[in-house]
Amino acid sequence: MKKSKIAAGVVVALAAVWCTSAWFTGKKAEEEYLYQLEQLNQLFTKTEALEESKIFYKNIKFERGLFASHIQDQIEIHKANETIIIPLSSTLYHGPLPLDRVAKLNFVPAIFSSQTLLGKNATTQAFFDITESEKPLQLNFAMNYSLSGNAELKLASGQYHNEQSKTDFDWSNVVLNIDLNQNTPNNYVLSVDTFNSNAPNHAVSTASSIKIKDLVVQGSLQSTKWPFIYSGNINSKIGYFEQNTESAESGEKFSLIQKNSQANLTTQVEGDTVNIINKTNLDELHINGNNLGKVTNNVEFNHIDGNALQELLNILVAIGKADSECLYLKHWCKNYNKQAWPLRIISLKLSLPLFLFLMKKAKWHWI
């Protein structure tokens, strides 16, 4: 038998195995996909922040093919006076070697990979308008056989004008990447090339503009027994940050520029207490046109009463929903005194220009 015939036979056999495996994993992918939707809806039900709305992720249609399936879903947000529908369309590529991954020379076996795009309706049309893109939001997802996976959410570059506040926003290359393990977000990376906002004088009491370039935020977080408190690390880097303000009443102007800033926030849970450690480094700090040099600080809050911190976070959420904050804060201060918040400043390094600037601005009160 000629070698060419043997090779052809091997190719045909492998193709047959691939087709059979793809069909089998397509069925498994459908089962896993619908299971994940059920888990997601249960999570929505338990999320306290959504108490005023009911959110459901509903599968409308699942058309299973040999190598890929086509899916129609919708997110339903039920509020007191309205229901918002967000349509989604997905292509789910079957394992063990999903075609979209093979096209990128990625041969790592997976149950499935998928690409989800935002559909058009009266609610979502605004996303297409402000981004001028047919793919304003795109979600790429892959799940392996250990039921861990990766999700990548992309927001197309765009511009937005808020008619009520007369504020302008624009952004470019916004990407959120999340590693998933046992249905729990573990690691994430948010990157933004540019973000700008501009709020004029006549819209607010103080005009404000913000410019951000090369923002990267990396985090590894785990939930704790407190709903709003997570343990882990958050690292952020900003290549350039600028904020300019101008008071509508006095006309006083203020300018702040930070270059190459890095920050690390660590939250540790020990029994009923929480430790918060923050480290920050700035290569350059400019205030009102004055270059004040480098800034480095290391601050720790050790052995914070976890219940006190959780109640404070609850109050901040309540304040956002209420007209007055006094009663909430008085109640909290009565229950938790300053001993619940031990502050330890480990180190603070200021450049000589910044030190002189702060000394010049300081107001001394003698007793």
Swiss-Prot record:
Subcellular location: Membrane
GO CC terms in record: membrane
UniProt keyword terms in alphabetical order: Membrane, Transmembrane, Transmembrane helix
Superkingdom, taxonomy of origin: Bacteria
TM ranges: 6-26
Topology versus the membrane: Single-pass membrane protein
Cited InterPro entries: DUF945
Keyword DNA damage: no
One Pfam family this sequence matches: DUF945
Family recorded in the similarity comment: To E.coli YdgA and YihF.
Stated name of the protein: Uncharacterized protein HI_1236
